[in-house]
């Protein structure tokens, strides 16, 4: 059945391709010397994704069907881990390194929170204690608020740096 092979699109946007080429999904090249810009883009996407992740966790708590939640939750888990792979490995600036570590921990938390919620929902019928654990789920919790603050801080720093660069070039 050689004639029936699937051909991959030339512009694949999988995490592996993005990480290997140092490009974002929009095709813009990441500057290795500007980890703050990369972290800002990653945090922006994570802020958008966390609303859907919150809905999946709340759906698991409400005992919505696994057939409905898993197709939504699985790609979220993969994308949160994929965003971690796109993170800069280290930052020279100690302040940026602190933000990088926080963002890495939050992305890991979000991926695991969705995965655990789906796993508990899948196994709930086995034990009453698992049902109590599902009842105790509280969305993404404090890390969701921390991600919002972290993104605001990254955006504010970037705006201040952009204005400083504009002023310096105008002089």
How would you name each of these model-derived features?
Residues 11, 15, 35-36, 96-99, ...:
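Short amphipathic alpha-helical segments that mediate assembly, nucleic-acid/protein binding
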Residues 1-29:
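Short Lys/Arg-rich cationic patches that frequently serve as NLS/NoLS or arginine-rich RNA/DNA-binding motifs
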Residues 61, 118, 122-129, 155, ...:
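Structured alpha-helical bundle/scaffold domains in large eukaryotic membrane-trafficking regulators
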Residues 6-9, 22-24, 152-171:
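Short, charged, intrinsically disordered terminal tails
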Residues 2-7, 68, 81, 170:
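Short, aromatic- and cysteine-enriched interfacial helices/patches
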Residues 79-83, 93-141:
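Long, amphipathic, charge-rich alpha-helical segments that form helical bundles/coiled-coils
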Residues 1, 14-18, 97, 117, ...:
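Intrinsically disordered, low-complexity segments enriched in charged and polar residues
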Residues 31-94, 132-158:
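Alpha-helical segments in soluble extracytoplasmic regions
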């Amino acid at each position: 059945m050689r004639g029936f092979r699937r051909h991959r699109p030339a512009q694949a946007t999988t995490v592996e391709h993005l990480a290997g080429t140092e490009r974002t999904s929009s095709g813009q090249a990441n500057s290795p010397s500007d980890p703050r810009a990369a972290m800002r883009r990653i945090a922006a996407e994570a802020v958008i994704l966390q609303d859907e992740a919150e809905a999946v966790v709340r759906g698991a708590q409400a005992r919505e069907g696994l057939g409905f939640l898993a197709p939504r939750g699985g790609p979220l888990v993969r994308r949160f881990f994929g965003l971690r792979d796109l993170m800069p490995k280290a930052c020279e600036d100690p302040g940026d390194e602190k933000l990088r570590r926080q963002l890495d921990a939050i992305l890991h938390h979000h991926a695991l929170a969705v995965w655990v919620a789906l796993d508990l929902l899948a196994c709930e019928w086995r034990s009453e204690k698992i049902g109590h654990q599902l009842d105790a789920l509280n969305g993404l919790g404090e890390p969701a608020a921390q991600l919002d603050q972290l993104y605001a801080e990254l955006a504010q720093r970037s705006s201040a740096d952009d204005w400083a660069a504009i002023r310096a070039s105008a002089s």
